[in-house]
Amino acid sequence: MNIGVIDCEFISGKGGKFPNLALMKISNYHKKKGDYVQLVGFDELNPISLFNNTQDRYYISKVFSKTQIPGYIKRGDNVFIGGSGFFYDHEHGLSDEIEHVKPDYSLYKGHESNEYFNKFSIGFTTRGCFRKCPFCINRNCDRVVRHSPVHEFLDTSRPFIMLLDDNITGFSGFYDIFDELNATGKPFIFKQGMDFRLLSLKKMRKIWDSNYYSGKTKSKGGRTFFYAFDDINDYDTINEKLNTYYSNIPYKHNLIFYVLAGFDRDNKYTDEFFEKDIRDTLKRIKLLFSYGAFAYVMLHENYKLSPYYDLLNDLKNVCNAPIHVAGKLFGDAILQSKYMKLYDWIESHEPQYLKLRQNIKSVTVN
């Protein structure tokens, strides 16, 4: 059987900076059955080739709903679609016999765009979360469960491990999984970040002492740990944990928090919400800067409705590219001064954006 797999993000060039794990598992599953599998691009797929059955079967996966694809490719009888870009709530996951097959890391051979495609083993040790964040793909989950042992997706020829777990710090077997990862001798990283609110000092020390990925340098000082600060209601908890973290940290490293903005949990998106949203966003960023932590601003698609659209874009540009501040380039002094120049920039820019715009009821940005 001839199998064509389509990675919508990868071949569209929009967001395809990471291999599609589900497609790699599907590929290996079929190869084990003796089938021929190839990565297919949109330019090779058209209504004629699709309906003339150039391939016996197509698997199409899309991670992001915003990724545009030709409408006709979903209409073939031999077409199977999946991924969070099509089904946001995991309604159509892989069968167990495919889910627990080792990924086919050769699927993207010759098409690699970065080190994720050829240097990392990729997989989940746990799945799920109990936070029920309304913007999250796991909003209908109520627990964190063990998914697979590390050896299930480990390619011993690859130097690093990338974990896609949703909330590893919320799993009861947290320490056992870190021991399992450390035992491989390979540096590893949790791409989705970790839940900072759940970090006890014991868990912090387990993370610090682990064989965590540090990029091109082998120094612990080159490590970057990712967390999230999405809700202003977590302010006191994050502040308390940051104080514990920086009071006990054994070596210097980078701490980055994803900061969500522009999302209304009540789904009303009124002027009052956007006023509060920008203030809450600034307050969260200021707290992180005060400790020397990094803020990485994540803008929900509805931020475009905000009267403070321009400030949110400014904040994103400043925080996510820290050497670029208000159109001027700065050197390492920004990082060495623990982001205080960025803190001052926000302080000086806040008043000019936070004037109530009484005549603005809604804003549409093209």
Q: Where are the language model's segments positioned?
A:
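Conserved, mostly hydrophobic/aromatic
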Residues: 30, 129, 133, 163, ...
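Ser/Thr/Gly-rich flexible loops in soluble cytosolic domains mediating phosphotransfer, phosphorylation
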Residues: 79-110
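Canonical Radical SAM [4Fe-4S] cluster-binding loop centered on the CxxxCxxC motif
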Residues: 16-22, 116-157
